[in-house]
């Protein structure tokens, strides 16, 4: 079953948004996710958050630092990317300045990643240098079990505070609190997705709050534990259509193996 993904896309020149919002039914991995309904936060509150950037400094996806030289992100963020043209900014509340910028020496995504179903939407980047923990740079642990439905989690990233007619895109890190919805519940009649939710996914939901079109690949966290990776969704912050994330516990073995072998 093919999925129609409707996205709110802020048309941009370089890294600056022109302020026009439209809709697109393009391939899911073409989107650049943005936090919807979030609030300003600081990197000190979420020091594992990183920005994936082009050589020119344009933010295109989020990611999570899991050890001194490994970043976890979504597979769809890495498809078609040349390692020499991907950089990671760490330790900054702003995606366009501050912190440190590190080159990437290797990247990989799950060999079972399916751009049609969005199953196994996980990838990693190996940094060109080891990064020590500081006040604003911390490693996040990988969850071993998916939290129960109803557990409060936080999604972070850079993006708009609205879900329609977004006139500006703040450069400050955003956070939004949502509630975990396990994959079986998300695939049930209680929500609208049905059979397109798979066991490599986990959902999270709160009315008018979501991770949507730059936040792709970013963290869904409970405490200092990474439970999900921003993957896809139908529209943004839509009623009974939760945001869908790659389920870290389900993909943990691949992440650890790839981290050790790259």
Swiss-Prot record:
Keyword match Hydrolase: yes
Keywords on record: Disulfide bond, Hydrolase, Protease, Secreted, Serine protease, Signal, Zymogen
Catalytic reactions on record: Preferential cleavage: Arg-|-Xaa, Lys-|-Xaa
Site keyed Required for specificity: positions: 210
The protein's Enzyme Commission number: 3.4.21.4
Family: Belongs to the peptidase S1 family.
Protein name: Trypsin theta
